Amino acid sequence: MTETVAFGSAETALGRLLVAATETGVAMVTWRDAPGTRARAQSRLGLPVVDDPARLAEPLLQLKAFFGGDPHAFTVPIDWRLTNPLQRQVLGTLFHRVPWGETITYGGLGDRSEAGVNAQAIGQVMGSNPIPLIVPCHRVVASNGIGGYSGGSGIEVKRWLLTMEGALPATLDWSLEEGPTPV
């Protein structure tokens, strides 16, 4: 049987997210859903596209709950095919061992994952995470501050996500219904 990928999207305070799921699990989450984005995702995955709403029902439901402020752990299966062994080790540790509302430093994640690499290498793994939000790279921070973020519109998205999870205090203009204003 030929492997396939199905696409679905979720409206969130951060915009319309695209989710790609194979028979194995969620393989990719991107920060926008557009025809070009889907084509690039399909090319990257190298799989034919099918229409399979049932495959996407649980991942989309869990993403909507997440953006509703529900402090749950994602329980959807993950398809790690777009990661190398180091990424899989580090991102797998992050997925299973850094829950809602907690943060960990880049160096701390390197230690916890027993990856044997420095904080800078962990930062590179976070920047290449094909499944942001579900594999919560926004929870990884610098030892001297919030650190960087390559998802969405950048650092303001990371700050918004950490505030939603209670890891950062809310500012007077913070809103669960409205994401950060793009810079």
At which residue positions do the language-model features occur?
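Short glycine/serine-rich loop segments
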Residues: 117-160
